[in-house]
Amino acid sequence: MSNFTAKVPLSERMADVLISKDRWKDDEEGYLKVKYGLEIILINVMKFALVYGIALVTGLLLQTVTVHLSYLWLRRYSFGLHATKTLNCTLISLLMFVLAPFVFQNIPSNNWIVLGTFGFILLNMFLFAPADTESLPLIGEEHRKTLKRKAMIGTLILTGIALLIPFAEMKTLIMVGSLFQVISINPLTYKLLKRRYRNYEKYE
């Protein structure tokens, strides 16, 4: 029994505890959907707690928030790759949002570097955004055009923020978070990781 339990992910065991299967005995499909949704929430909460807990302990909270928000701001409309395994996702999150802020926190940037970097980012948004995944194909040409337009507008807004912010080191962190998102939508990344690109073509 203990060997079986050890092989069950913690998030699944927690979901089993939080959801009473007896209440869903007449709706197995509904139970599985709710359980899966709860597992996703628990995984994200635990990952968030781990990343930000380490950032807090190491004195990197502001740096982590800056990189993470910049990344999420662009990802909202440009989408991009997701790790296929929870462990990989957690490790990548630690590298991106803890290790990278630690490495780049004291590196200043001027506005010429900001303009050059965000020019590159804007070009990538124009060429490659939005990028979908096997589990989340972005169906509909007009929908994709709208997302691309919003991703480019979001890039311009973030460029303005990076230019106006008075802290040279924070400019660097904003660019780091933004470049992480560029990596996640670039077709070369898909190719290197052997992931399918333009998944919507399978449905159109």
From Swiss-Prot:
Primary location class: membrane
Membrane topology recorded in Swiss-Prot or TrEMBL: Multi-pass membrane protein
GO molecular function terms noted in the UniProt entry: peptidase activity
Subcellular location: Cell membrane
Pfam family, one: AgrB
A Gene Ontology BP annotation from the UniProt entry: quorum sensing
Keyword flag rRNA-binding: no
Swiss-Prot/TrEMBL keywords: Cell membrane, Hydrolase, Membrane, Protease, Quorum sensing, Transmembrane, Transmembrane helix
EC nos: 3.4.-.-
TM spans (from-to): 52-74, 87-107, 111-131, 151-168, 173-190
GO CC entries: plasma membrane
Disulfide bonds: none
InterPro entries per UniProt: AgrB (IPR006741)
NCBIfam families, A to Z: PRK01100.1
Family membership: Belongs to the AgrB family.
Biological role: May be involved in the proteolytic processing of a quorum sensing system signal molecule precursor.
Name of the protein in its database record: Putative AgrB-like protein
